[in-house]
Amino acid sequence: MIERQKQIGFGWIALVIVLFTGAITGGVMTRRARHIADVSQDSSLPAAERQIESDYDEALSTVDENYADDIDYEKASQASIQGMLSTLDPHSTFFTKADFDRLKQDHEAEFYGVGVSILRHTDAVYVQSVVAGTPADKAGLRYGDKIVEVDGKDAREWTGDQVSKSVRGVRGEPVTIKIERAGAQAPLYFQIVRDSVPQPTVRAAYMIRPGTAYVALTGGFASETSDEIEKALTDMQKQGMTQLVLDLRNNPGGLLPQAIKVAGQFLPRGYPIVSVRGRTENAQTLVYKNTEFDGAQDFPLVVLVNRNTASASEIVAGALQDHGRGLIVGETSFGKGLVQHLFTLPYGDGLTLTTQKYFTPYGRSIQRDYSSGSLYDYYVRHDPTDEPAPAAPRSPTLPSSPNTHDLASQPTPQPTPSPKPAGPAVRTAAGRVFYGGGGITPDIEVKPLDVATPVRARIFEVAFHFTRQLAAGQIAGLENYRVDKVLYGQHPRATDYPVTDRVLEAFREFVRKDVGTFGITPAQIDADADYARLRIRDEIVTAAYGVEAGSRTLLDADPQLLKALESLPDARRLAEMVRASSAS
């Protein structure tokens, strides 16, 4: 959760940062060190702060005068600041000017680039999809283009982040991208003028079934998020929406005011949404209520969360769960209940600094424990039983094993029991009991399909390379799968680009010719043929209709979404139960 703060203004941290960065940019550390010493002896400062500054001054001078090699002062400065912040919590972080500018761009939901989604595969970074109407779309970049150079620099060994940083830049300035395209005899060059690229936080909104709307708020919480949700709900109601699935999975959070506004669109006016407590001038508890919307519609609502649902999205899920407004389905959320402010440093660098903690309407702390100091434990191992596994490339795709709850026999939905409650219990007005201190626990737990197994990770990889050739008309006998133009905004019929037995056999042959490269055999594909079909279907639909259509293909077989749809009658019963308790 991030809020804005234009200037830094907090105690000795600011003083040390300003003095150290000033010393380095001044270029004369010993003279600057004497100035620091004068400041550190200022009797108006507390003794503890004077001691800290004195020790810092001594260490700085000793390094400057005695280190055996040249000193990278900028690197030393950045490491010093980050080291200090890392002792506080996992979310207080230092940013260089370039990274800080990028962070602020992300929260303004706009950046200057070309409009492509990219991903690092085994041998290079490739274009996964192109955003309709952007400079990249107009220039002719396509799904599957292999990025070879950016502005004359060899990019074949770059990470996706390196390519992204190089492609982004000043609005109106060109960037030259050299690509290799399946079926092309020679590399192609594109000079593309950078422009603003919209980054909507509502990534999908459509009627998934008659009367049932699906809205994916998965792109964070930026300055326009509340407006996007309001528009999506209005559009869905015009199309006959009577019940809703709100998808908050993989939403990393963002701006606190936007989280409050989004939650307010589902709650009666005056309802509390979140309380915030700080240590200094914010030490008093601030309770934020719905003051803008009459969001008391009583249509059934199911909210999807997973382990990557964090911060602002947990505020929304927690408020809806506390008030009984929505049924939560999925996995226990990330557990980030700390509020950061953005602080700008004198030379354009910046900080995100934790200044407050937030709590659900009934007082639950969402923040997970981070006292071990291990960032691996905090970000990867959500509980001690977790084992490390390869990162899943995309969302789960196939129905999983039976769910842990069968709501057909539970007319009054209850939260999933937590075996080891991390915080104190709270009881809502409707008599439901929840525990704080460990994220938002779903009412119905549904595990995603394990797509991170070694075999499935390889199927994902080879499916992309196969479809890259398929969409270019390079697979013998399947030339009719060639994609000449992307039909954005359309959803394919089941008969469009079907993954038939013939396609699957071509896939096996593609693997058979290059087993050494992909590390998978046709027999392994046969053992997981349904997953292979789904991966190919996702890729070819993405190539032909864009990433939104590809995502819908995956959602059609998403076990968590399928359970959410199945649970809508239980969401209706929950709403009726809460209304009855409020009336009594």
Question: What kind of region is each of these model predictions?
Answer:
Residues 1-10:
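N-terminal positive-inside, membrane-proximal cytosolic segments immediately preceding the first
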Residues 26-36:
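Hydrophobic single-pass membrane-insertion segments
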Residues 12-26:
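Hydrophobic membrane-insertion alpha-helices, especially the h-region
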Residues 35-44, 57-66, 211-212, 542-548:
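Acidic/histidine-rich, surface-exposed loop or edge segments in extracytoplasmic proteins
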Residues 64-128, 172-204, 274, 558-565, ...:
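Extended, small/polar residue-biased N-terminal targeting/export presequences
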Residues 2-3, 36-38, 47-48, 52, ...:
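Cleft-lining beta-strand/loop regions that shape enzyme active-site pockets
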Residues 60-69, 81-93, 108, 122-123, ...:
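Sec-exported extracytoplasmic/periplasmic mature domains
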Residues 365-366, 370-584:
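Conserved functional hotspot residues or short segments at active or partner-binding sites
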